[in-house]
Amino acid sequence: MGTRGSGHGEREYSGTLSLVRSVVVTKTIQLASAPADVWPLITDTDRTNRLVIGTSSVYKPIEPGAKSSARFVVETRAGGFSMSYEEAPFEWTLNKSFSVYRKMRSGPLRAYTYGVTLAPTSDGGTRATFRLELEPRHWALAPIAKLQGNRIVANMGRIAESIDAHLRDSAPSPFIEPTTPANEERLDFAKRELVKRGLDGGVIDAIVTMIRSGPDADLVRMRPFEIAHGRGLDGREMLRALLHAVTLGLVELRWALVCPSCRTANDQVSSLAEIGDESHCQLCDLSYGIELDRAVEATFVPHPSVRQVTNQMFCIGGPWRTPHVVVQAIVEDGSSRTLEAPSEQARYRLFARGGAVASIDVADDAPEEANARLTGTELTPREIRLRPCGKLTVTNATAEPLHVKIERLGYATLAATAHVVTTMSEFRRFFSKDLLKPSTPLKVASCAILFSDLTGSTALYTKAGDAAAFRLVDDHFDVLRKVIDEQGGGVVKTMGDAVMAAFIEPIACVRAAIACLHAFEQFRIDAENGELTGIKIGLYAGPCYVITANEAIDYFGQTVNCASRVQHCADTGEIVFEEDLFERLSAEDKAKLRLVERVETRVKGVEHPLRLVRTKLATDVISARSLERSRAAS
């Protein structure tokens, strides 16, 4: 991908007062690390700008109707000058090159273009080339521009060498930054309390260390799964500990609204009640509906009484912010750009600013070249096939410059979505007042709903009496709640003798159902009058809506209706669920079940019948009480 406005040597610009030459500075260095290893660090432009420029920036949305590829106007200081500029979206090809063009509105420059190219070398290393082009407003400013350009490029070279040493020799990170002091007394208190609550010791140490000595940039948006992933810890345990930490005044919980395309946060609120049914991403120029499992993410920040952190922005557009985007480029109005297809065979998405999309199937047997045309809010064709590293030419037939990007669809996200968080028992216990706006049901694209029902309760109440029966029913709720929590789900509510629970993944829901049957069999052995009861379970997965009902988070929709109907198809000791889900189970999971029957049932409002399996535990459990009675009789 070429660098915008790039050329060889110097370029001339005619001004009303003088002839001004642009200043071009380049530097090439050799690195021992491979381009793919250097890329995630060298493209962290927020941190590199922090080190090289040293002054933060203020980002404001560009004026509506501006015929520009830029989405923001930036105000900052550099080299002793105040300046503002329109920042075009960064352009890049993964692991190969990136660049950015800034059209200056004020300050000593007309324009600023910066780019980095990473080329693999025969020894497995990288040839890194840095190129900076500065266009002064007046010829007298050219020497200053040259001086500043040399300084910036030299500093970037040193940062790249530090990155290389960090990767190759485990040298300190080049991004070590000064930190504000933490309140050690509050930290020690919170650590002791977290230990008392039985939370994972490694997770507790990681949280305390991060709050004590982590840079502000890492603390203004603490993402539990990302923190855990980087330290080899369990993500749910990290999330669980941070929820506990909120109750101890160690951190505060925030909800970030995340764009479904660039996946960056464009707004942040402190309560679920502040979330509406729609948000807008300025960068992607995209309005989108709020879905709890895609567009709302839980993040944390140290409580101000523990540590004061500042949210300074030095750059918001570098490739590091959107690792799922493999190519991004600006296509001027009425022109075309040729993009390189990804090297890995998979399905990708072509996205154009404003929301037009097309699918890209990268496969060895696909054509070498393909074309796409952008008209209004549509990309045609909607289905594109390309071989790895093939050429895709995109034509912009609109009246304004737009950026396009190729996105990985299967990129694993490290977001602790609101759907994940609200299914956790800790959230329901500690944050029962953090509810959605009553008039705003929010969609969840995929959720597995489990219903259980206690059987034999009529005989139980008759024989044991109301008090003993009520106690047994309540105790069985505790048993199921513990198992559901351990399996990654959350109890939504109890209704009479029944439990309703929600899970993120359908297979996890099946595993929880199996574990519930095992746990209940032990409960029948241990509990007085337990032998009078049984349990049956049904589950179903699909889209649903999350609402606030009876001052609690609840679920409704056809998926919930289907799950309830499926549970009614079960007999005592059975788990009933979809046939397709049964076939997706691993051999290990299937071995835990015995298939009783394949059945079909209809649900009102669902066009086709549900194809279900009735299953039992693979090994029938004989209660200890039955064994004792058999021994006594003999």
Residue ranges and their predicted role:
Residues 244-315:
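Cys/His-rich short segments
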